[in-house]
């Protein structure tokens, strides 16, 4: 099981049809619930409909206090139409006697962050949900709406220019905590360590196999073609290939001692969409060290060390 199993990302399951009795119990026991935000007003208050109960999350209760400035406004506005977690702080009735609820998402996030600060460490495998992507990285909800950054360079061993070449918004993924700045409550993730070593990936292929790949780099000396997210090979230089092209290639040689795979392009194909699920070789636990390179490789080893910030 992932190390954050006690506080999962928002929106992984559909919220129930709430009754007033369910909300009364939640006031008493402090249960964490989820619902879909219907509206955000000009003061950045959020509104939800929980069965017959009209609910409000005041702006000061929408996000954790360590999120401020423009980031805070974006964090609030981006919740409209999406599920959020909350506790039910109180129940009352409006002027017409209809039930209303006052909610807090901030309290849930503060509790989750304290659990993370106590128990989550570098190397921990976590489940996450991709909530936004930029060229420099993917923003991933790793529990109760707490967002960590997964830099593009850490997504896979095969190079990509943008996270959308590997993920889609809303996708459930696994990741590894790379850096946890507990003082500033900032978490950086990595991902490639879960996608298998060079040998693990290369073992799926044999010389003279013809397989589909994606062009990831066009150089003067050849083109890099991704065979798997953590494995690429090199073809001869071709002027008709562009990054992102799909190709069929024949594997001419596999050389573990040099971490090299020689390919020959057979045909140019339409680009492929990112898969719904990724081929994870590791799905839980805490990593201390991960070595991508084969043991007998003549090149300097590619290693990830997981250590705490001093």
Listing of model-derived features with the role each one plays in the protein:
Residues 1-310:
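Single-stranded RNA-binding regions, centering on S1/OB-family and related RNA-binding modules
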């Amino acid at each position: 099981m992932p190390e954050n199993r006690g506080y999962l990302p928002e929106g992984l399951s559909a919220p129930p049809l709430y009754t007033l009795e369910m909300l009364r119990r939640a006031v008493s026991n402090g249960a964490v619930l989820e619902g879909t935000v219907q509206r955000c007003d000009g003061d950045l208050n959020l509104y939800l409909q929980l069965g017959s109960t009209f609910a409000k999350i005041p702006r000061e209760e929408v996000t954790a206090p360590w999120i401020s400035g423009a980031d805070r406004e974006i964090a609030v506005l981006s919740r409209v139409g999406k599920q959020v977690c909350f506790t039910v702080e109180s129940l009352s009735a409006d002027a017409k006697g209809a039930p209303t609820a006052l909610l807090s998402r901030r309290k849930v996030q503060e509790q989750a962050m304290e659990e993370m600060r106590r128990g989550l460490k570098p190397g921990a495998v976590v489940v996450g949900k991709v909530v936004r992507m930029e060229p420099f990285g993917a923003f991933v909800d790793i529990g109760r709406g707490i967002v960590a950054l997964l830099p593009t360079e850490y997504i896979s061993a095969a190079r990509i220019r943008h996270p959308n070449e590997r993920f889609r918004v809303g996708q459930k993924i696994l990741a590894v905590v790379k850096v946890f700045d507990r003082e500033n409550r900032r978490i950086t993730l990595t991902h490639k360590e879960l996608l298998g070593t060079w040998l693990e990936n290369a073992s799926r292929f044999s010389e003279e196999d013809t397989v589909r790949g994606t062009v990831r780099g066009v150089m003067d000396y050849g083109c890099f073609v991704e065979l798997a997210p953590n494995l690429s090979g090199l073809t001869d230089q071709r002027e008709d290939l562009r990054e992102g092209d799909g190709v069929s290639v024949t594997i001419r040689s596999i050389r573990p001692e040099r971490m090299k795979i020689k390919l020959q392009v057979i045909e140019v194909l339409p680009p492929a969409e990112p898969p719904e699920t990724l081929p994870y070789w590791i799905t839980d636990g805490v990593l201390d060290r991960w070595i991508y390179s084969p043991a007998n490789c003549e090149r300097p080893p590619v290693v990830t060390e997981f250590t705490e910030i001093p």
